[in-house]
Amino acid sequence: MSTIVTVPRSVSWKGDAIAVLNQTKLPHSTEYKTLTTIEEVWKSIIMLEVRGAPAIGIVAAFGLALAAKKYNTLHIEEFQKKFNRDCNYLGTSRPTAVNLFWAIDRMRESIREITTIKEAQKILEEEALRIQQEDEEVCRNIGEYALTCFKDGDNILTICNAGSIATARYGTALAPFYIGKEKGVRLHAYACETRPVLQGGRLTTWELKQANIDVTLITDNTAAHAIQTKEINAIIVGADRIVANGDTANKIGTMNLAILAKYFNIPFYVAAPLSTFDVTKETGAEIIIEERDETEVTKIFGKQVAPIGTDVYNPAFDITPNELITGIITEKGIIRGDYKREIASLFEKQANT
């Protein structure tokens, strides 16, 4: 029996404002925050009120459409100058998530040849809405392909939150859980809590429970033991950037899981849209890894848990080498084998369509 699965949208366009699901408040309260300026959009991304690579791209696109409505100029040259300034400004918010730059570049390109301000404003709004709609379709396709990798009753481990609230809908790594729910295929999620910001504990568990999908929360330290004792059948994660050879940047701790998957001989899948690929970089060594504030580690919900002055290393992401990845699940299919060749072939086909 098919089931319609609904989860609150992470980003909604209101015409003269953006409503974002404030993910820092989850799971205790479901609060929407209204953003009316480009500065508020930038801060919302930085503060992780909006997070997840596709959702960041979507809110950035809407942020640029919003800003363009407020430029105090009658000259298209000045309009373009202000717009490019705001594009560059938003790009400073989260350097690792390639979807951010993909969305910014797409918005910039959409009005490159436009000669009137009114037309530019209209096109920017339409392009942002198109980016959101396309992401929903892309995520559904990812879920359909991912579901072919699993069978009814499988236990699947994941980390962070690559779910519906990190995208337009469905998510990437969590998409097969939603598509499976709709099609009557039961998948049980094991969610790593994901220190230090607890995206797994706060967000993945919240949204899966909203959809009545089975989920079990574990500490990050428990992953190996869970694989060993809970009959984990596979691991699936999202991605913030995938380079030309398949090396993948994702939430810190992802590489740990890939190593465990290899040791225990279970599949390790990465689920991501083509917009997350950065084929201008050859290997993961070229990816800039964002380092976040030390208080994310030294404090938990505002309470100091480490001695003041303790040295902290707090990278937000790590790089999983391609040889640890069983397959990369995209909206166009599953990439396996020689990642450098297959990724190049896929993008060549895309360029010719």
Curated annotation (Swiss-Prot):
Pathway: Amino-acid biosynthesis; L-methionine biosynthesis via salvage pathway; L-methionine from S-methyl-5-thio-alpha-D-ribose 1-phosphate: step 1/6. Its EC number is 5.3.1.23. It is an enzyme of class 5 (isomerase). It catalyses: 5-(methylsulfanyl)-alpha-D-ribose 1-phosphate = 5-(methylsulfanyl)-D-ribulose 1-phosphate. The keyword Amino-acid biosynthesis applies. GO terms for molecular function: S-methyl-5-thioribose-1-phosphate isomerase activity. Substrate binds at R51, G52, A53, R94, Q199, N250, K251. The active site is at D240 (proton donor). The record marks C160 as: Transition state stabilizer. Transmembrane segments: none annotated. Belongs to the EIF-2B alpha/beta/delta subunits family. MtnA subfamily. Homodimer. Catalyzes the interconversion of methylthioribose-1-phosphate (MTR-1-P) into methylthioribulose-1-phosphate (MTRu-1-P). This is Methylthioribose-1-phosphate isomerase. It comes from Bacillus cereus (strain ATCC 14579 / DSM 31 / CCUG 7414 / JCM 2152 / NBRC 15305 / NCIMB 9373 / NCTC 2599 / NRRL B-3711).
